[in-house]
Structure formats: structure tokens, C-alpha cells
Amino acid sequence: MTDETKLTYADAGVDIDAGNAMVEAIKPLVRATRRRGADAEIGGFGGLFDLKAAGFTDPILVAANDGVGTKVRIAIETGAHDTIGIDLVAMCVNDLIVQGAEPLFFLDYYASGKLDGAAAAAVVKGIANGCIEAGAALIGGETAEMPGLYAGADYDLAGFAVGAVERGALLPRSDIAAGDVLLGLASSGAHSNGFSLIRKIVAAQKLGWDAPAPYAPGQSLGAALLTPTRIYVKTLLPLLRAQAGIKGLAHITGGGFPDNLPRVLPQGLGVEVDLSAIAVPPVFAWLAEAGHVSAAEMLRTFNCGVGMALICAEADAGALLASLRAAGEQPVALGRVTPAGAERVTYSGRLSL
């Protein structure tokens, strides 16, 4: 083989220079996420975090990882890449806060068939914005260019978050009991779950992402569906630190109430949810009608308007509701903890679909 015919990595579809240029471009975004314990510099073999500098005394580390499911397909097809990274952070850090943990640092994985530096940088910008909102340092990541595994401009994301909680403050507490109150915090929409069903409904309706959103005047359907997942850390962390009476938290993701509420309940206990208390966002009413989706299927697929659930003693509910309102939330009294029956999650009232 002559010098003229020798192959290079670039000939195989991997552009090392493009990857290095992207890393340089995102360094200012990453630095903006620095916090106590991390300088948020990237480029080394691993990210560093000084747990002592973060102020913990007897901490337990909590780790979570997640993705954004097929919501990423909408970002790819619309070319709107700047908020999907917020979703990625939210899905991970919300799983930390429900265990009482303060998010400390975050790492991401971005995989594509051919690296689009501008798209990747926009994704990382969203990740950095999510990290800032969650108070987590973005201390590292991996950008993988893998020709033959992803078609065209397709990419996928994974996130990894680590937090810490003092040993005595771990959630859920062991004293959750029948009669405790269930509170709900509003979601911003579908968050990052159920998008395979959403995309199927959109296709059946023969709608494009640039079509007007049937449920959101003034927005395109793609933009409305890309509304980022809420990050609940800034609301909940001060209340946890203040020992405001939160006994348990549940992040309402895939599986809805039936799958997620039992994860924080002791054996022998269930919960009754008052569906009429939920202010259901218009997106869910549209999905239910357009897709002929039953209320039961909606409840086991989507958050239906409640992205985070809290459990507290009845005596603490009034003060906790007031604190949540002072933090800018619109909490609802969602139900009560009950002795478990045949189904651990039961319902009263009806969803406003």
C-alpha cells in the first residue's frame, strides 16, 4: 500500500480534530457550572470532586443515571438541540433529590454516527444550563463518534449524576404511616417520558413538528413538546435542609403514579390519589383525545401534570404547602397514605382530560 492509499481514522468516519474542536468550544460552558468541591475543568482523564470542600460531615453518596428516551428524536428532526440537555440533567438529578441528596456533579455521554460540532455544543449548553439550575458541576463526559451505529445526524444521550446526603437525612424516612398526606408539584408537560406513544399519535394525526401545536397557541408542535423537564432541586433542597417535615419524595416518570409512588412506601402501605385535584396540562388532554388513550393508560404512561410527589405528616402539611407556595410552586393536596389493598395505588375523582 502506497502512502497515497494508506487509510486514516478520518477515512473511517471519525474526525479527531472535530472532536477536539468541540471540546474547546464547550469549555466556557462547563466552567460556568463550577461549585464548591469542583473547578469544572474538562480535558483530563477523569473529573475530580472534593467532598470535604462541599461541607458534608458524614455523607452517603447517591448515584443516578438516565437518558431522555425518544424525545431526542424530536430534537434531531427539528434541529432544536439547546434544551434536550436540560432534560438529561433533570432526569438524573430529580432521582437524587428524592433520596434527600444534593446533586454534586454530572457527566454526560453523547454518541453519534458523525459528529456535528454545532449540534453537540448546543446539547452541552443545555446540559450546562441544567447543571447550573441543579447546582451540580459538569466535571466530564464522553463524545463518541461511531460510524455505522447511528444514521446521519442521529445521536443519543446518557447522563450520570452523583449527589450526597448526610447519613441521618436519607429519604424515604422509615416513619411513613397511614394517614400521611400526599402533595403534588406541577410538571411542565410530558417531561421525558412517553415520547414513543407521543410520536405515534403525532404520526397518526399526520402532523409535522412545525405545525401549530393544537394545545399551545403560538407554538409549533415540536417546540411545545420539547418543553424541558422541570428540575425540582432548588425548590426541595432548602426544605430538606430546614427539616420541613418531608418524609418521602417520588419522581413521577415512566410508569406514572402506579410504578413510582410505591417505590417510596413501606411494605403494607398504599396511597389514594385524588385525580380531581390535578391541574392537567393541555398536552395530556390532547394526547388522550387524539390518540384515544384511556385514563388508565395515561396514568401509567405519563406524569399527567404531577412531576414530583411529597409525603408528610398531616400536622406538617399546612406549613409545607405554604413553604412550597413561597418558593413559587403551586402545590396540590393529592391524596393520603393508606393501608395497602390489592392495588397499592388507588384513585378517587377523575382526570380532567
Curated annotation (Swiss-Prot):
Keyword Cytoplasm listed: yes
Check the record and name the Pfam families matching this protein.
AIRS (PF00586), AIRS_C (PF02769)
Q: What class of enzyme is it?
A: ligase
**One GO cellular component, as annotated:** cytosol
Q: Which reaction does it catalyse?
A: 2-formamido-N(1)-(5-O-phospho-beta-D-ribosyl)acetamidine + ATP = 5-amino-1-(5-phospho-beta-D-ribosyl)imidazole + ADP + phosphate + H(+)
| Protein EC | 6.3.3.1
- Kindly give the SUPFAM superfamilies that the UniProt entry links to this protein: PurM C-terminal domain-like (SSF56042), PurM N-terminal domain-like (SSF55326)
List where in the cell it is found. Answer: Cytoplasm
Q: Does the keyword Ion transport apply?
A: no
Q: Which GO terms describe its molecular function?
A: ATP binding; phosphoribosylamine-glycine ligase activity; phosphoribosylformylglycinamidine cyclo-ligase activity
Q: Name the chain's protein.
A: Phosphoribosylformylglycinamidine cyclo-ligase
The organism is Methylocella silvestris (strain DSM 15510 / CIP 108128 / LMG 27833 / NCIMB 13906 / BL2)
